[in-house]
Amino acid sequence: MITINNLDFSYKNAAVFKNISLEFKEGNVYGLLGENGVGKTTLLKIISGLQFPNNGTCMVDDFIPSERNPYFLQNIFYLPEEVITEDTTPEKFINKLGVFYPRYDHSYFLNLMKELEVDANNKFNAMSYGQKKKSLLACALSLRTDYLLLDEPTN
């Protein structure tokens, strides 16, 4: 479960959000809706431990994300809107990433790529935007984390 209580966050002197409280229960799929600049990406980064709130608390199960506990980190994955994949393939990308996630399932990755009709050995820079998004989603799903945070997965 993800529990957020009285969370504040600002960049320099510009408040992004103030005093928000939310609860995300296990086994559900949630979506964050809002205009650009209201803090959706920032909230995902706080939940994943990549940014730190100014005030308030964020708990994921019994962990405080900002403490970067190794067990916590292997059970959550944040897929940003844009990923720099440079001159590599989904196969090489997931092989480097998967070592950090004990439940990573390479067979599942290959099955997803086949189902999505994307070649795991094509370079990202030769793919269409849609193929790249599908490939990154297959990578994320194959990590088998308890929490999967997707920023603009279909954009």
Predicted regions and their residues:
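Catalytic Walker B motif of ABC-type/P-loop ATPase nucleotide-binding domains
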Residues: 148-152
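Conserved ABC transporter NBD signature motif
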Residues: 56-67, 71-72
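Helix-to-loop junction immediately C-terminal to a conserved catalytic motif
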Residues: 48
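The feature captures the beta-strand-to-loop junction immediately N-terminal to the Walker
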Residues: 33-35
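ABC-family P-loop ATPase nucleotide-binding domains
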Residues: 78-135
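Conserved structural motif at the start of ABC-family nucleotide-binding domains
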Residues: 2-4, 17-19
